[in-house]
């Protein structure tokens, strides 16, 4: 049976290898946790959750180097198109199909924007991605806790979820625990923590709380680690 391989490259950057290779939020250069260089990455698709520099990251450089497609909320897609990137836009609730993979935008509660040389670009709504291939995975992006996470479970039933736990700019471990209870996944992959001092989190405590209070397994990854699901 073919499996989806999920690789963590630190912070919120994940590589999903299935029928296509999808890179989510490729913050590579400047990411002290990252295990790879730009030249190591050969994505078919880049999925961007929002425009902040630690998520949009190196999307433009990678897309120009590899010729891959980029999927993003419509305003970010238009910005990327202005840079010569093959970007496809959608909006919350909409899907983009590339090959056998369906990329669906779902809500996130966060801010958004693109800062370029002091000029602020409108980046539309922040989002999470539900990626449906051999299995279904959910990358929440940067987000606070919101009750419609229950709808992500009801509609898509993701097997694996990638959730921020660092607090300050996103959910902390206590809020992320409630998110897991709503999402009901088999696997939880913590992200967006310990990259910077202001988002330090006790990931071991998060793992214990989730596994004591839900049926989900928390996989604590180091940059470069992978899991096949």
Swiss-Prot record:
Tree of life domain: Archaea
InterPro entries: Metallo-B-lactamas, RibonucZ/Hydroxyglut_hydro, UPF0173, UPF0173_UPF0282_UlaG_hydrolase
GO MF entries: hydrolase activity
SUPFAM superfamilies: Metallo-hydrolase/oxidoreductase
Sorted UniProt keywords: Hydrolase
A Pfam short name: Lactamase_B_2
SMART domains referenced in this protein's UniProt entry, alphabetically: Lactamase_B
Keyword Isomerase: no
Claim: Hydrolase is one of the keywords in the record: yes
Transmembrane stretches, start-end: none
PANTHER family noted in UniProt: UPF0173 METAL-DEPENDENT HYDROLASE MJ1163, UPF0173 METAL-DEPENDENT HYDROLASE MJ1163-RELATED
Family according to the record: Belongs to the UPF0173 family.
Record protein name field: UPF0173 metal-dependent hydrolase UNCMA_04270
Lineage of producing organism: Archaea, Methanobacteriati, Methanobacteriota, Stenosarchaea group, Methanomicrobia
